Amino acid sequence: MAANSTRRPIIAFMSDLGTTDDSVAQCKGLMYSICPDVTVVDVCHSMTPWDVEEGARYIVDLPRFFPEGTVFATTTYPATGTTTRSVAVRIKQAAKGGARGQWAGSGAGFERAEGSYIYIAPNNGLLTTVLEEHGYLEAYEVTSPKVIPEQPEPTFYSREMVAIPSAHLAAGFPLSEVGRPLEDHEIVRFNRPAVEQDGEALVGVVSAIDHPFGNVWTNIHRTDLEKAGIGYGARLRLTLDGVLPFEAPLTPTFADAGEIGNIAIYLNSRGYLSIARNAASLAYPYHLKEGMSARVEAR
């Protein structure tokens, strides 16, 4: 529940629906019809269709940047029309993140109260990272005819089972009345690659390519580096795909790498070890992809 009851409700909307037709507009039109005072923020509608893990990456950090009371409507629904239902959860807390571990807006009175945010998504693993990073207080299967159509369009569950109920929640419909409570084991999750220690090295994977820049992100977090005694200024060897070693100091900015094209090893804005070329692409000329191994060690 929002700390300020006079604040306009907010829905942050992420999907794989694209922007080449009226699908997103239909969803947003229904949101405004159900909750006329709502502000709908478009997070992203161009994620790779049906890629649950990519979608999970786009939504996990959002609470750091949104006011208390925001409803996050997040969807990629490959099983549309089946028995897969949506799940609505109240997260426990907005976890700290970023390269330095700070809150967005820290120092400006932006502390978040526990239980301030609701996510609604298909129960297909999309909330995996959210639940692991933030924890949750309550979770429900979204089945009530008060918040979803009695005969939902089977090919458009993103609209029927996510967008519409998110608007009811933003309008104040009680979370506990959207459907039956879910046990933890009933919430679908995917397996996240673990970061492991191999001698003095940390071993993870390439978690994302930062398009369109061609920067390479790994799943090795700032906290993993801290435990290994690695901080800014340490000279690192980062080996990708087992055969591509790059060496550079860990620096806060791309410009610290010096000339254009030089290698920069840095922490991205989400707090994960990353590698780039200053003002140039690294991923594209080296054909780097998600899922490749990433091994880092101090030199």
UniProtKB/Swiss-Prot annotation:
Show the SUPFAM superfamilies listed in the entry: Bacterial fluorinating enzyme, C-terminal domain, Bacterial fluorinating enzyme, N-terminal domain
Q: How does activity depend on temperature?
A: Optimum temperature is 55 degrees Celsius.
Q: What is the effect of changing D16S?
A: Loss of 5'-FDA synthase activity
Which taxonomic lineage does the organism of this UniProt entry have?
Bacteria, Bacillati, Actinomycetota, Actinomycetes, Kitasatosporales
Q: How is its activity regulated?
A: Competitively inhibited by S-adenosyl-L-homocysteine (AdoHcy) and S-adenosyl-L-homocysteine (SAH). Sinefungin is only weakly inhibitory.
User: What is the source species?
Assistant: Streptantibioticus cattleyicolor
EC number per UniProt: 2.5.1.63
Which terms are listed as keywords in the entry? S-adenosyl-L-methionine, Transferase
Disulfide topology? none
State where S-adenosyl-L-methionine binds: D16, D21, D22, S23, Y77, S158, D210, N215, S269, R270, R277, N278, A279
Q: Which domain of life is it from?
A: Bacteria
Protein name per the record? Fluorinase
